[in-house]
């Protein structure tokens, strides 16, 4: 019995470990170097899904700390990614509290809203408080590929949730 409980704890921390790994490893930057225009903000997809389905797996403090780590690794001013992730948490929490039954279509639409506000805050703060330059075409590609890969990761995370974590939605 204790062995099963221990395995469940490991499976429950899987998304959190993946979030920290993604923030430390610069996977997004490496994908952009391999594929010319393919860039993906996988952290936002991960945070949004698990805040909607199982918020106790990813606490707000962990997400904020992961944002700080991401800022240090990527060379952004400290706190910009964290604030962007907190916007994702805010929209996800609002949707979770106001909806009775979530579907992939409703999650996808609300993810678009969350991503727009999150990126708007991120790039306006980055533009006003740093000397880093960015092109709007890269932002557009990032939003496009993140939005259209969301259903794929939604299905993969649902399979992970049903098979390993448990099917209990909030």
Residue ranges and their predicted role:
Residues 1-170:
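Terminal, non-globular segments
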